[in-house]
Amino acid sequence: MNLYFGDIPICYSHSTAMVLQAAGYDFRSDYLEAIMAMGNGATLVKKDDRHPLVFFDNGMPDESISHCLQILGFDYEEFFCDSSEPVNVIELKEKLKKYLDHGSVIVGPLDMGYLTYNLNYNHLQGVDHFVSVYDMDEDWIYFHDPAGYPCVKMDFRDFCKAWKAEAIDYKRGAYSMWGNLQRNKLPTSQEIYHSVSVIMKQRYENGEVGIIEDYAKTIRANGLNAEQKQLHQFFSFRLAAVRSLYLSQFLKDYDPVRADLKEKIAV
């Protein structure tokens, strides 16, 4: 099947691709998305007897960015802190500046409800997002937003409100960033495949059991409410489909059985 390229919310893969490209490494977003192996299994994100919410993944974007860089042979610096800890904005700015001395920086998750240049920000509270930061000065931060906003200029203190990611549960911590990327290993394609397979296996083994089956039973009994319909129509189904498609493309030369299975899941 042909690959799909279009408006899909894989901001963490797009931002990683932009930062890698700025450092002189060309990796397409679909390839990075496959290596991150996000689209396997399912996670219950809202418990409700009649209308629960389920995401069709079982990995966090911030952890997946780190896994992806490691799999591809990159050394890098990363930072995040406990969301409950107070943060000195001046110290945070200095750390980001130090990262920027070595090139662009992956930053996120951000809470899109604070990204006021996006006309829909009022409806995006608690939605996670990642961007590629390429510069900053005394008051402003400059970045590319893969949601359709290149060359954004934003007040740094306002940006920090989004960067705290207080309303986002699926993260390692607040104020996360990755920078100073240097590729010191050149793994073979077979080695990359093996590393991805190990992560997929671990995520399936550590994931919750029976979520999709239980979710289907609940839908049969109670139908879908407006929140569920909106989530699946505008986000989760199309994201799950493209993740399966990209992973199918990645697996086809090494594991045609699983590649075929992923393609069937996509359609």
Give the predicted meaning of each segment:
Residues 15, 31, 64-67, 91, ...:
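Exposed alpha-helical structural elements
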Residues 5-6, 55, 123, 230, ...:
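Short, charged/polar micro-motifs that form catalytic or ligand-binding hotspots
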Residues 25-46, 51-57, 86-136, 144:
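Active-site-adjacent substructure of cysteine-protease-like catalytic cores
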Residues 138-242, 247-253:
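Noncatalytic regulatory segments and standalone regulatory/sensor domains
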Residues 22, 35, 68, 95, ...:
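Residues that form generic nucleotide/phosphate-binding pockets
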Residues 248-249, 253-267:
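Long, low-complexity C-terminal extensions of enzymes
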Residues 11, 125, 236:
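Short, contiguous, pocket-lining structural segments
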Residues 1-89, 181-182, 187, 192:
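Cysteine-nucleophile protease catalytic domains, especially the papain-like/related folds used
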